[in-house]
């Protein structure tokens, strides 16, 4: 995962911060009955990831940390990760998937294009959702 962060630094032209939840995926996702997936290449290297956290006392969940290695974007990896997360949500009684998009919009333009292609609609500024 650290390697992926370093590659993100090169692609973004700035050093991304490590979100605390990524430092202990087991405690922050798996032990909470949430989920986190990694996309692995043929050399067993992480090339992408996505996380999902339930919203307490609802049938909704938030997606987090969708990341694809920059040199592997537009090869369907992000779509496969998203489809995997959405399938898990459906199988676990989650009816609505939500995602928070970063700002400024120009910096996160890929997210603002990616999610609508997969049926997500904006319901508040910087937030999108999809009924599963």
Walk through the language-model features, giving the residues of each.
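Conserved acetyl-CoA-binding loop-helix of GNAT-fold acetyltransferases
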Residues: 65-68, 74-87, 91, 113, ...
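Short, conserved glycine- and acidic-residue-centered signature motifs
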Residues: 18, 78, 108
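Conserved beta-strand-loop-alpha-helix junction that forms the acyl-donor binding cleft
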Residues: 73, 96-111, 129-132
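Residues that form or flank phosphate/diphosphate-binding pockets in enzymes
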Residues: 58, 76, 110
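Short acidic/polar active-site loop segments enriched in Thr and Asp
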Residues: 95, 121
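Acetyl-CoA-dependent GNAT
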Residues: 1-64, 69, 82, 88, ...
């Amino acid at each position: 995962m650290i390697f992926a962060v370093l590659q993100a630094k090169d692609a973004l032209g700035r050093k991304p911060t490590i979100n605390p939840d990524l430092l202990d995926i087991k405690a922050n996702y798996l032990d909470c009955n949430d989920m986190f997936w990694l996309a692995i290449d043929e050399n067993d290297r992480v090339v992408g990831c996505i996380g999902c956290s339930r919203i307490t006392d609802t049938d909704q969940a938030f997606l987090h940390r969708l990341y694809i290695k920059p040199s592997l974007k537009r090869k369907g990896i992000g779509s496969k990760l998203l489809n995997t997360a959405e399938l898990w949500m459906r199988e676990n009684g989650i009816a609505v998937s939500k995602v928070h998009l970063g700002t400024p919009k120009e910096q996160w333009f890929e997210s603002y294009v990616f999610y609508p292609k997969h049926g997500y609609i904006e319901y508040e500024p910087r937030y999108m959702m999809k009924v599963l």
